[in-house]
């Protein structure tokens, strides 16, 4: 272990769509958590790794906490709360453009039993007038004994370096858990599937997003500069399959083009992406289907 090397695990907690994934991608400098304006975008805890010369922070981006309406929803909330027993610090992220609501209070109640340092992170300050920020800080200030309060813009990067510096100073001396050039502990197959699912969320209508899972069936390196990726998009109804395929296959082609570009950035090679769409009724409420589609809580 290096002398005076600080390391540890930090959970990012918050209501859906407060910008947790945007912050994580900002910190590690590459897209590993998918972003969308649709709720429940992040379904598994994704570990992003930030490393500098004398410190390493392993971030866990949890699914947004919400009132569950299906077994998948139960999994997502349990997944978010289970991280609180595993970490050295917690970032409680709130949206500066929204009033404090029941979802925030739900999280605050669960954080009252956490003995680790809790940071209040007020995100999206680039979207509000500075005068409003003081009101937001006052609204949250007495809800918990926060280690620090950081107003940030994950999108623009405002105050993100200062937040990282504070976390480094908070973490104990410890080992470097991962190599310096590693930014996540998830395999390429998992991230490729998430990038494809992001494009489905971006491009399809409201009916589809919560009913979509992606299984990457195969990643095969055909030569030194070419990678074949084969994946199946799983939906619950035939009508959703029709939306994703689109007229003459146009929508599926758009999804493929956009996803391929991001996968190429991740892999650093030319990618041939083949996509299929499969109907699997009620997969969100069947435990066996959840596990087959990658929702195994112990894995993350």
From Swiss-Prot:
Segments for region (G5): 152-154
Cystine crosslinks: none
Chain ranges of the Era-type G domain: 6-173
Binding locations of GTP: 14-21, 61-65, 123-126
PROSITE patterns: G_ERA, KH_TYPE_2
Domain KH type-2: 204-281
Region (G2): 40-44
Keyword GTP-binding: yes
Region feature (G1): 14-21
Keyword annotations from UniProtKB, A to Z: Cell membrane, Cytoplasm, GTP-binding, Membrane, Nucleotide-binding, Ribosome biogenesis, RNA-binding, rRNA-binding
A single BP term in Gene Ontology: ribosomal small subunit assembly
Chief subcellular location: cytoplasm
Chain spans, region G4: 123-126
InterPro entries noted in UniProt: G_ERA_dom (IPR030388), GTP-bd (IPR006073), GTPase_Era-like (IPR005662), KH_dom-like_a/b (IPR015946), KH_dom_type_2 (IPR004044), KH_sf_prok-type (IPR009019), P-loop_NTPase (IPR027417), Small_GTP-bd (IPR005225)
Compartments it resides in: Cytoplasm; Cell membrane
Pfam families xrefs: KH_2, MMR_HSR1
UniProt region (G3), positions on chain: 61-64
CDD domains: Era, KH-II_Era
Membrane topology note: Peripheral membrane protein
Molecular function (Gene Ontology), one example: ribosomal small subunit binding
Family that this chain belongs to: Belongs to the TRAFAC class TrmE-Era-EngA-EngB-Septin-like GTPase superfamily. Era GTPase family.
Role, per record: An essential GTPase that binds both GDP and GTP, with rapid nucleotide exchange. Plays a role in 16S rRNA processing and 30S ribosomal subunit biogenesis and possibly also in cell cycle regulation and energy metabolism.
HAMAP family assigned to the protein according to its UniProt record, in alphabetical order: GTPase_Era
Subunit details: Monomer.
Protein name listed in UniProt: GTPase Era
Organism: Ligilactobacillus salivarius (strain UCC118) (Lactobacillus salivarius)
